[in-house]
A protein has these predicted regions:
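Glycine-centered short loops/turns at secondary-structure junctions
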Residues: 22, 38-40, 182
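Dinucleotide-binding Rossmann-like beta1-alpha1 core, especially the glycine-rich loop
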Residues: 59-143
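Extreme N-terminal leader/targeting segments of oxidoreductases
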Residues: 1-18, 33-37
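N-terminal Rossmann-fold NAD(P) dinucleotide-binding loop
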Residues: 27-28
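Helical element adjacent to the flavin cofactor pocket in flavoenzyme catalytic cores
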Residues: 161-208
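Glycine-rich Rossmann-fold phosphate-binding loop(s) that bind the pyrophosphate
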Residues: 22-24, 46
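Gly/Ala-rich phosphate-binding loop of Rossmann-like dinucleotide-binding domains
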Residues: 31, 35-36, 177-179
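Glycine-rich FAD pyrophosphate-binding loop
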Residues: 35-56
Length: 208
């Protein structure tokens, strides 16, 4: 009997503390965390694990630099703290990556002002990454000779993080961790209905 079939059998008539519907990044992380703490966890997904939003990311794990434009400081702070936590918790999966923005006369911000924003972003993130830099056109040429600097005023360089492997594998790592902790996980299973009876939820699922 294959792994999926064995997990389908466990779902049939099984009693669980938690049923997680959806095996994307949120469901997978929740399952791994709960199962590791001894909860009886079941995870289902109507498609494959990480088959929808969680496999259509850019692999970027960022702190929300763009949101500084709207002065959403708390949001940026929360995103930076989450990014930092992920880098520390999964050093083999997440790495720091440098970004460079080249700015000309038509850019909305001058290099010095963009540099102030990048520095604020770094400070809000507790200085966890390498510090940002304001770049002259000459520095941009040294770093990236392919970039034309004829009309550039300068640029900035700052850091965020990215998933080294693809996003789907990152998600499935949490599914595997949940399985190893005793969770029941089955893909291509849809949630049909649920009703409360005898102090418990009875759930009807369908093997698709």
């Amino acid at each position: 009997m294959g792994l999926r079939e064995a997990n389908i059998d466990q779902l049939d008539g099984g009693i669980f503390d938690v049923l997680i519907v959806g095996g994307g990044i949120n469901g997978a992380v929740s399952a791994a965390a709960l199962a590791s703490r001894g909860a009886r966890v079941a995870v289902i997904d109507r498609g494959d694990f990480a088959n929808f939003t969680s496999m259509q990311s850019s692999n970027l794990v960022w702190g929300g630099f763009k949101y500084l434009e709207n002065y959403e400081i708390k949001l940026v702070r929360d995103l930076c703290m989450s990014r930092n936590h992920l880098i520390k918790a999964y050093p083999a999966n997440l790495k720091e990556i440098r970004f460079m923005a080249a700015l000309d006369e038509n850019s909305p911000y001058k290099p010095w002002f963009a540099g102030m924003g990048a520095t604020a972003y770094w400070v809000i993130g507790n200085g966890f990454t390498k510090p940002p830099k304001v770049l002259t056109p000459e520095k941009i040429t040294q770093k990236e000779p392919i970039v034309r600097t004829d009309n550039l005023l300068g640029g900035i360089e700052y850091s965020d993080a990215y998933i080294v492997d693809n996003d789907s594998r990152f998600v499935f790592g949490f599914i595997r961790s949940a399985l190893n902790s005793g969770a029941t996980c089955a893909n291509y299973v849809s949630f049909e209905s649920a009703r409360r009876q005898g102090g418990r939820w009875q759930v009807q699922l369908r093997d698709t």
